[in-house]
Amino acid sequence: EDDFVRFHPIINSGGDLVNVIPDYVTMESYTRAANVDALLRYNTDINRALRAGADAVGATCELQDLPGYLPLRPDENLRNVLRDNAVALFGEEHVAVGAHNAGSTEMGDVSHLIPVVHPWVGCAKGVLHGANFVLDNEEVAYEKSPEVLAMTIIDLLYDDAKKAEEI
């Protein structure tokens, strides 16, 4: 599970009758992973499996690989600046540096170009992207979290942006 590989398919068109191999099927999917090497390796394996499935039923398989989100690579130095400010505001017991998770975001793409940090803030409950996902702490969401970000910006820009230049 170190590579956090996830494969998300959806069949857009898959025939008209039960128990009949359709003459035409379209499927869209994407593969996510914690690093680019794993992403490429597992995508190759998935493509091989899709072709094998088509071969098994005498079908053809046309694949078109398109780029998706790159894995998120947060900058440790920038993360530490933000973490120190979060600890100052929320207290050590309320701040944790999480491990990689299986989510994906365009911030992953940005993280391959410049140093980034992607903080998660505990101000909501429910399943992320789910119908039951709701904000349950407005103070943290609208006041404290922006304050942590502002403090981080100040730290980065202080002393002619010395810290930002280091990062």
What positions do the PLM features span?
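Surface-exposed helix-capping loop/turn segments at secondary-structure junctions
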Residues: 1-3, 56-61, 92-94, 157-165
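Midchain, well-structured core segments that form catalytic/ion-binding scaffolds
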Residues: 1-80, 84-86, 99-108
